[in-house]
Every structure is written in C-alpha cells, then in structure tokens.
C-alpha cells in the first residue's frame, strides 16, 4: 500500500513555472495569475511593439506599428497601402475629367481645327468653349516662311511739270535695281572650276554712252574735280619700259632713272619698284617708317595675274607717287634701293 502511494507521488508531473492563481486584468487584458512584468523587461518590450505596455517614464501611450500620423480612426487601423504616383497620362485624364465636370475648357474654339465633312459647329458648342474669338494665325519663323511674291519694285518718282527727263536714265535704273535679278539667262563663270552660275549683266548697248548733261535750270552745273596727272614721259635717249630693258639680273646694282625726265616740274611722278615679295614688303615698311616725307602716296604689294586663273606672274611690285620732279630727286638720292630690285619711272600705261 505504501509502495503504491510512493509510486503515485513520483509518477505525478511536477508543476513548472509560476504558480497558477485566479485570472487578473493587466492593462485591460485578461491574463492568468502571472505577475506584472517589469517596465524594462523583455516582455514589456514585446508589449510596446504590439501597442501595449508601459514606457519607462510611467505613462501609457497609444502606439501603432505601421502608421505614423494623427490619432488613428477605425479605417486607419490597418496598415496603409502604398500607391505609386499617377502617370502623366492619368493625371492629364483626371484634369480633363474635372474640367468637364466643372464646365471649363482649357482652349477656346478655333476655326483652324478640322472637322468631318457635313458636321458644323453650333452656337452651344461655341458658348461651351468660352465664346472667345478665334486665335490669330501663328507667325512662322523667318527661315520657314513661304517665299511668295517679291516686294513691289522700286520705281522712280514721277517727273513733275517743268522738269526734263534725260533719255535712257529711267530705263537704265529699272535694269539696275538693287533687289531684282538682271534679265538674261545665267551664264557659267569661267574663273570657278565648279558649275556655279552667275546672272548675265544687263544689256546696256541701247543706251547712249555719251555723258549725260542736266539742264542748267533743274540743277546748277558742277565743276569736275581735276584728277592728279600720273603720266610722265621718258627722255628720248632712254628706252621705253615696255621693251623690257628695265629688267635687271639678280645681284647687279639697281638701275636708277635719269634726272630731268619730267618736262613740267609740277607734274606728279610715278615710280615702280620691283623685286621679290619679301624685299618689296621690307622696303615698303622702311619707306613708311623713316622716309614718309619723300613721297605722297605708296601702294600695297601687288602682282599681275592672267585673264584666266589666279596664278601670279612676274615679281612683286609697289608704286610710289611723288608730287613733282624735285621730290622724286630727293627720294632717289636719299633712299637706298637694295640689290636685286629695280626702280623705274613709269606712266599708267607701263604699270
């Protein structure tokens, strides 16, 4: 008998954990007879994550796990659903829908919008669009405008009574208009290697080549300004520059024109200096820098070219103009011409 009682005592399952007692309420939750957990225990941290439990400062706060914002409502107890922002087409469709509901239209009616044949716009539709006037036609940029008719041609003012029109002047001005292409078929430019076409010049053969004279009553006569005389004849004993005797070999002393070649001392004298490009440029710089008082004008460096093509012919040249023979004599006596260069007196025919 005693053995059976001992076996029953050993076979009974021992009770583990906290002793069970009457149910108690912990912060509104019915629990078993468990003691109140400490505020810094792991159980309290679990309750805090679930929205229950005490904070270390002793105050209870209503917390939520997913939603951070104002006081929750019955609809916001569940976690919020992430919605991506609407696309551009969706937002545009919503704006159109709101305008249609409010009775507003973005753009007024325009007569340039095409409609199917047989369909006409009513007054109600125009009123629904706002009743605005049609927009003006948009101006195209300068480069995209259609090339329509040309601007009206510039005409001469009508001849008033008492004035005399010179024969051929009106027709000549009509042919030489600034913004009008000259009549005639385009001709090919021989200088350019490509197939570039240039308009033919106007035909001026039907006009009088004599100098036009204006009546003294219409405008007072103007005295022509005398041009400087550039022609200077050479002495009979000196050969002409056209014969080529003025050409000089490289290394020989430069030739100088003889004195007393100008008959009239007041006649302007013209000298032509020839040499290589570098020699002529250096001499011109030296003349303009230190001997500018010995001449009146000096040209830039130039060379001859044939009628067809652009190949340079001969040596480089410069022209020096003196006021009279006395100034030319001072120029020849003062300026030292480098070896290999030639200086000759010439006229416009020999240039």
Curated annotation (Swiss-Prot):
It comes from the Viruses. The keyword Lipoprotein does not apply. Residues 28-46 have a biased composition (Polar residues). Pfam families: PPV_E2_C. Transmembrane segments: none annotated. Residues 49-65, 143-158 have a biased composition (Basic and acidic residues). Residues 11-262 are annotated as: Disordered. GO terms for biological process: regulation of DNA replication. One of its GO terms (molecular function) is DNA binding. Its main location: host cell. One of its GO terms (cellular component) is host cell nucleus. Gene3D superfamilies: 3.30.70.330. It is found in: Host nucleus. Keywords: Host nucleus. Plays a role in limiting the replication of viral DNA in keratinocytes. Recruits the host NCoR/SMRT complex to viral replication foci to mediate repression of both viral replication and transcription. Belongs to the papillomaviridae E8^E2C protein family. This is Protein E8^E2C. It comes from Mastomys natalensis papillomavirus (isolate African multimammate rat) (MnPV).
């Amino acid at each position: 008998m005693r053995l059976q009682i001992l076996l029953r005592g050993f076979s009974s399952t021992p009770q583990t954990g906290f002793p069970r007692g009457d149910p108690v309420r912990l912060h509104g939750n019915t629990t078993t007879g468990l003691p109140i957990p400490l505020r810094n225990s792991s159980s309290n941290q679990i309750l805090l994550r679930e929205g229950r439990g005490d904070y270390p400062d002793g105050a209870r706060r209503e917390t939520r796990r997913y939603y951070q914002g104002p006081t929750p409502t019955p609809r916001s107890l569940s976690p919020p659903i992430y919605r991506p922002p609407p696309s551009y087409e969706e937002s545009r469709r919503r704006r159109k829908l709101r305008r249609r509901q409010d009775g507003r239209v973005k753009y007024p009616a325009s007569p340039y919008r095409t409609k199917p044949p047989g369909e006409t716009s009513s007054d109600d539709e125009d009123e629904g669009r706002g009743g605005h006037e049609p927009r003006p036609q948009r101006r195209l940029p300068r480069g995209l405008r259609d090339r329509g008719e040309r601007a009206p041609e510039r005409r001469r003012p009508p001849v008033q009574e008492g004035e005399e029109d010179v024969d051929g002047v009106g027709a000549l001005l009509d042919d030489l208009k600034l913004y009008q292409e000259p009549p005639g078929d385009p001709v090919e430019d021989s200088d350019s290697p490509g197939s570039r076409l240039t308009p033919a010049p106007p035909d001026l053969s039907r006009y009088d080549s004599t100098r036009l004279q204006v009546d003294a009553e219409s405008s007072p006569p103007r005295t022509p300004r005398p041009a400087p005389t550039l022609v200077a004849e050479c002495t009979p004993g000196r050969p002409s520059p056209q014969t080529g005797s003025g050409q000089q070999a490289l290394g020989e002393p430069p030739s100088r024109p003889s004195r007393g070649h100008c008959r009239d001392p007041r006649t302007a004298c013209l000298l032509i200096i020839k040499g290589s490009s570098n020699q002529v440029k250096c001499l011109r710089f030296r003349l303009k820098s230190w001997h500018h008082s010995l001449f009146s004008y000096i040209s830039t460096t130039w060379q001859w070219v044939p009628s067809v093509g652009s190949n340079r012919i001969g040596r480089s040249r410069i022209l020096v103009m003196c006021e009279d023979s006395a100034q030319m004599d001072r120029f020849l006596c003062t300026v030292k011409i480098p070896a290999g260069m030639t200086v000759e007196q010439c006229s416009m025919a020999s240039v």
